[in-house]
């Protein structure tokens, strides 16, 4: 049996969310099928697979490696093979850098063209794009936005089902993610960065981190804490001024 043949079975039996399955298929078609698709399941060229992984950006390589492991985990489960060519393979370390985001005043000062309303809505409510794209006027009532689904189906987790105070600017989002991402990129940010705008707004207005966790729909409080520890250069300057004022009062 060829890897391509087995993968078609995997898509039917693997237990993942529809969005995850969509991503699996895209990754396989783009990166893995040209390399291992025509190889026998029991005789994948490990060197060729490793070379492919090393040729990819670290994050893509990591996702592809996890997908190969998933494909062969299912193969072992269904007695198709007893090997996994992904065992022992490595990918380059993922470099984590500070993610750029805009503060609310910066967002509000910019012209976002045809997406003026939608961008401001994202920045003031902290919804994931897939959540915001599923919102209709019926989901906005009693001065709250009720988040109960995404464009891909159910919410990411139970904690993603929530309500957030409605602060205006609602206008239906486009059916595709790409136009708004292109709009955001022109200003050096991403659509997802507007969640950080919202989180930073909560932080600067004194909203407690546990409340922010609820509003952002984070299942892990550490995710919220990582956002809450975002510090702008201006805050460093302000901290210096505060300490200087304190010392001057003591003298």
Across the structure, where does each feature detected by a protein language model lie?
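Conserved tyrosine-mediated DNA breakage-rejoining catalytic core shared by Y-recombinases
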Residues: 88-94, 134-169
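Short, basic, alpha-helical segments at the C-terminal edge of helix-turn-helix-like DNA-binding modules
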Residues: 241-247
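Short, basic (Lys/Arg/His-rich) helix/loop patches that form interaction surfaces
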Residues: 112-116, 125, 177-222
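Catalytic-site neighborhood detector that most strongly recognizes the C-terminal catalytic loop/helix
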Residues: 151, 216-241
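Basic, Lys/Arg- and aromatic-enriched nucleic-acid-binding interface segment
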Residues: 58-66, 77-133, 195, 246
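Short, structural beta-strand-to-alpha-helix junction motif
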Residues: 1-6, 40, 136
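N-terminal core-binding DNA-recognition domain of tyrosine site-specific recombinases/integrases
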Residues: 11-73, 78-80, 96, 175-182, ...
């Amino acid at each position: 049996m060829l890897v391509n043949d087995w993968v078609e079975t995997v898509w039917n039996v693997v237990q993942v969310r529809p969005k995850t399955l969509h991503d699996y298929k895209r990754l396989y078609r783009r990166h893995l099928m040209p390399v291992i698709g025509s190889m026998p399941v029991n005789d994948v060229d490990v060197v060729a697979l490793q070379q492919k992984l090393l040729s990819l950006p670290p994050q893509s390589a990591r996702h592809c490696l996890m997908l190969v492991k998933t494909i062969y985990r299912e193969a072992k489960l269904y007695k198709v093979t007893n090997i996994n060519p992904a065992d022992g393979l490595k990918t380059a370390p993922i470099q984590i850098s500070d993610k750029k985001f805009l503060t609310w005043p910066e967002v509000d000062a910019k012209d976002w063209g045809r997406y003026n309303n939608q961008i401001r809505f994202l920045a003031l409510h902290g919804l994931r794009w897939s959540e915001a794209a599923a919102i209709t006027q019926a989901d906005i009532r009693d001065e709250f936005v009720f988040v109960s689904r995404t464009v891909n189906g159910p919410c990411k987790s139970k904690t993603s089902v929530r309500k957030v105070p409605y602060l205006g600017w609602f206008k239906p989002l486009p059916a595709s993610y790409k136009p708004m991402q292109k709009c955001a990129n022109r200003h050096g940010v991403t659509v997802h960065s507007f969640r950080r705008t919202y989180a930073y707004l909560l932080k600067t207005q004194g909203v407690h981190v546990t409340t922010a966790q609820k509003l952002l729909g984070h299942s892990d409080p550490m995710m919220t804490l990582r956002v809450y520890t975002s510090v702008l250069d201006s805050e460093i300057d302000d901290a210096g001024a505060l300490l200087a004022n304190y010392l001057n009062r003591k003298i």
